[in-house]
Amino acid sequence: MADAGDAHSPRRARHGLVDVAPLSQLAQDHFADVLNFIPDAKTLLIDPTLAGPLSLMVDLAALRQRGVEKMFWMEEVSVGLSSTRSVRIHAPTKQVLYLCRPEPRWIKTILAHYIADRDASGNDAPLEFEYSVAFVPRRTEACVQFFRKHGCLQAINMFDLGLEFSVINSDVLSLEDPLAWRRLFLDGDHTPLFHAAHALMTLQRIWGVFPRIVGKGDLANRLCDLLLRQRREFLATDDEDGNARVRSDGTDPFTGTQVNPTRLHKD
């Protein structure tokens, strides 16, 4: 069986280092897909915590080629504001695309911008802007329900921008989620574990099944359980075209490696 530890793997660079270029390319492709879905000129409003991952992924010239005219950092709107006039956005384009994590502060900010636009335009008049949101790494049901509750779900286009591991160096990968520890240990929110499991599954699709998983602590154990469950679901589920996730010869269609689910175990 060929796995991430196979020195003869075609996805390994010289000197035994793993070639992480596919991860960078995957992130760039996901971002390009979102930008291309809005062909018109667009303004980006960006969650400041995404500055690091985005800077590692794209440059200004590439953004301009895909119709990005202006970029601004998102600023959190105070929940106590009684008027929406002060939260109107002044974008130079009709298309506005938010890039943010699915956090309450940002969906409230987006709602405040939408309400200000609606009030300024009048209930029966077209809005000045068209709103799209790319949630990193993916939308949550809470986001969808929030927009539905406030009557703007149909007016806001939502995408999932699956940015997972950022390539910091040839041997350093990071999820670049500075609030993960606070969510896990203070808020009791295990969403970061779910996102981490998805990211680790992506690694397995590229390089093959992890032959060994080692962790320490309750949260590491929960992450491992999530990863094992997702791997089993992946192996047991057919894709959208009806093709088996595992070929008849027992290899993974993503990696070409021999699949043996029993190799995925915890120590």
Give residue ranges: language-model regions.
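Extended, well-folded catalytic/binding cores that form a central cleft or groove in large enzyme
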Residues: M1-D267
